Amino acid sequence: MTINFKEGILIPIDKPYGVTSFKALAHIRYLCSHALGGKAKMGHAGTLDPLATGVLVLATGKKTKQIETLQQHTKEYVATIQLGATTVSYDMEHPVSATFPTEHITRELILETLQQFIGEIEQIPPTYSAVKVNGVRAYDVRRNGEHIELKPKHVRIDEIEVVSFDAEKMQLVLRVVCGKGTYIPVSYTHLTLPTT
């Protein structure tokens, strides 16, 4: 079977932990270009955080014109959340920057609180994100020590399921079905569990 990279194909890859979506794309582009003996036109549909793993869809040739359409499809994520602690990047890239009481948190309270996130919501992307500000990625601005404020954006969350909750460790695993542009770390960072 001959693959026509110029006409285009879609290549779903399992993006590894610690690799940016762009670096994953660059590596596959290099391999394809080497195999073809020339430069392969490629792009990726959507962006996964460097610390996220999962399916990243790459497109070649004429299929790159479908990237915008592909990004409109619903996505599904599974996230492990440590309740009672946060970091400046809302993930494990930085050390814990603040802690909060957790004695009042129950599975019932979590289920009740999660309902406020279902539907169309406004979400402020994390400053350590791939959002571009004046042509520069927000995480590059932050890593240069500069302060940045991002504007809220409308996102859609269709479903949130509690996969597991470990009350002793205060760890929560969620499955989230959502639309384009949803930042999962932000969704659970703003999961305010009120004290009684």
Spans of model-derived segments:
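Catalytic/RNA-binding core of pseudouridine synthases
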Residues: 1-186, 191, 196
